[in-house]
C-alpha cells in the first residue's frame, strides 16, 4: 500500500510537496523518520494525507514498540473482523477484513496536520507519526 503525503508551508502560494510512502503491511507503523515525512516545508504546517480507504494516520507514543502492537490489538477489539461473518456489514465482497478496515480508518482519520520548524514536525518528546494499515 502506498500513501501519498502532502506538506504545505506558510506561503499560501506554495503548491506543496508530495511524496509516496510504502506501508510494510498490516499493523501500526512508526513513520516519523521516513524520508517522505521529512519532505515537510522548512516552516509552517505539514498536512499528511493518506490516499487509501483502509489506512489511517495518527500521532501517538513512539518510545515503546509495544504501543504499536497494543494499538493494533485495541482496534481489532473495537471493530472485530468477526462482524463480517455475523451479518453486521452489507459491504462484504472484498473479504472479512475490508469493511472493518474502512470503519477503523473512519474512526482514526486519513489526514493529520502538524506544525513544522526547520523542516521537522514539531511533536513532543514521546510522540511519533504512525501509518496504520488496517488490512
Language-model features: where?
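Active-site histidine-anchored catalytic micro-motif
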Residues: 1-135
